[in-house]
Amino acid sequence: MAFMGQSKMDTLARMAKDINPEINLRLFPQGVMPENVDEFLNDVDVYVDGLDFFALPARRMVFAKCREKGIPALTAAPLGMGTAFLYFSPAGMSFEDYFKVEGYEQQEQYARFIAGLSPAMLNRDYLVAPEAVNFIEKRGPSTIMACDLCAGVMGTSVLKLLLGRGSLKAAPWGMHFDAYHQKLKSTWRPFGNSNPLQWLLLKFIRPVLQRGPPRG
């Protein structure tokens, strides 16, 4: 409860300094925008995606800039009680080529982002409070178990990249681990969301995203 009501940025900065008091942090309280994205990525070796799910325009901008600068970009999404992981190599498939959200309205972009994040959808059958998720109101709470799994998978992947210790499969390869079902699934979606399997998945996802708040 010590951090209740405080900004996420200030809270995470304090946590990082508690772990390493000598850490050098550059904070961007105004957010990442076209005007400061180059400064944001200055001297970056690996980009770890920590943007909110609904910040898709900013995410697309940062991933595009990472590719332009030759920076590896990784994302790990907390889904249900698991994590879905993707790695975008500067020499491999791009974020845009994989997710293919250009030219679509907002809800369809969200649908395509979800489908691309987790082609396996291992978490689809155990959500007990579906009303907690509302894409119209931009609500999608995460469990702490999923967030901790994201941190573990991401930390290990960054270590492998920075130290050159073993290979890391890049998009269109993906990985989803679900602790609830105790399942690990590797996915391969050539052509990204243009893959026929993704078309079928999108047919399942679109109606879910159209749900509004429950009627009294």
Predicted ranges, named:
Residues 35-37:
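Short acidic active-site motifs
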Residues 161-216:
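Phosphate-binding loop/pocket of nucleotide- and phosphate-handling active sites
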Residues 1-20:
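Glycine-rich phosphate-binding loop and adjoining beta1-alpha1-beta2 segment
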Residues 46-89:
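ADP-ribose/adenylate-binding Rossmann-like module
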Residues 95-149:
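A conserved mid-domain beta-alpha-beta active-site/ligand-binding segment of alpha/beta enzyme cores
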Residues 40-42:
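A short, aliphatic-rich alpha-helical micro-motif
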Residues 29-31:
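Conserved acidic residues
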Residues 90-92, 152-166:
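Oxidoreductase and adenylate-handling cofactor-binding alpha/beta cores
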